[in-house]
């Protein structure tokens, strides 16, 4: 529900409504679950798909992601009924949500990405302060080849810095200076995704109750007003 809110801009109730239709059509497993674990069938079919389509080095079977506090785990995690079905017929919204579920399921069984973090500090003669930049370079994409987790900060998702290869003691030449004026922002207002995360942290409700809880807060009682992200 959180990722559908971030990536697809679906409301919680919209996500659950679409997921219900996918379940009724037999495209996904039971969607009102708090489990993060997959069945042996899902593990084996995911491994075969990954090895056949990406190579064995991209496969890493894992099934224990840790149990959330208060989780009942009566069902396995939400997943496609058949891993080989990379797409389905249906409405554009149904196809988008299915694609999200499919990619997250398969990516969860792929190898970790390997990155190298670079931290460059640049000094100048006669200046005490140092300029600093940090970035990461992907050595092996692993699960990133298929899926990248989003955050509640669109700017963070969009920013990507690629640094050149440098060595300690290299001399650099100034090619231009640009000054940016930035201000400390007030805490962000809740989105559907961040509100669900807060409910999880406070152990309030379960996946099956998040949608009606948020609907009650916003529509039924008007405790919360939903608006655009600039307000």
Question: What are the language-model segments listed below?
Answer:
Residues 1-231:
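Core catalytic DNA strand-manipulation module of type IA topoisomerases
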